[in-house]
UniProtKB/Swiss-Prot annotation:
Sites bearing Phosphoserine, chain numbering: S149
Positions of region (5 X 22 AA approximate tandem repeats): 82-219
Residue numbers binding heparin: L164, R165, T166, V167, G193, E194, R195, L196, R197, T198, R199, M200
Sequence repeat start-end pairs: 82-103, 104-125, 126-147, 148-169, 198-219
This protein's record includes keyword Transcription: no
Name of the protein in its database record: Apolipoprotein E
Lineage: Eukaryota, Metazoa, Chordata, Craniata, Vertebrata
Protein's gene: APOE
Modification Methionine sulfoxide occurs at: M145
Amino acid sequence: MKVLWAALLIALLAGCQGKMEQVVEPELEPEPELHQQADWQSGQPWELALGRFWDYLRWVQTLSEQVQEELLSSQVTQELTALMDETMKELKAYKSELEEQLSPVAEETRARLSKELQAAQARLGADMEDVRSRLAQYRSEVQAMLGQSTDELRARLTSHLRKLRTVSYTHLDVYKRQSLASQPLQERAQAWGERLRTRMEEVGSRTRDRLDEVKEQVEEVRAKLEEQAQQMRLQAEAFQARLKSWFEPLVEDMQRQWAGLVEKVQAAVGASAAPVPSDNH
């Protein structure tokens, strides 16, 4: 039974291939949002990831019979999911990088920008999720309406994708403007950091100069103290020499007088101790 349904589906798709190409070909014409997307592809990694997401969708739409087989399988949904995950990962990384660069900015401003970027990021994610759900819905409708015109289903999907792409690029433009709006804050924060760094360098330079001056003053005071100490030593030595010159004669005279006194005492003692002559001799 499944083989019969598959054969019937292939026959219907083969018969509608000519009409399908007429429906798809206008989609390949340049659109304003596609020009914007081409410009954005030279920007941030998250913009490149989102561009790959829409490039993949446009490639799917350019297929004829093969696209139906792909849509009836889960390959397209899985690949779109992978592209969505890649885009959201790049968005989160870009948001984290912005928050890190805005660290010197006031907490209130940083919180507001973070909230706005998170809201824009959520809208982009919702847009891509809507694309995936509509592809799943289209696949279900193809499976349920094999007896109806597949051209109508293709046209509906093409219209939905065109509208979703327009809305998505509108949200992307909002996200990009909000991210660019934070750049002046980043520049001001960098300028503020540069001024602070310059100010700290000036303060450090003045402090080093002041320390050098204090060091020179300390060296000068130390030299003066050493000079004064030397002068005091010389004065003390001179005073000691004068004292010595004053007292040496007096001491010598006292020593001579003491020596003379000792001699006299010794002579007196010696005379008194001499023996008296005897009458028997």
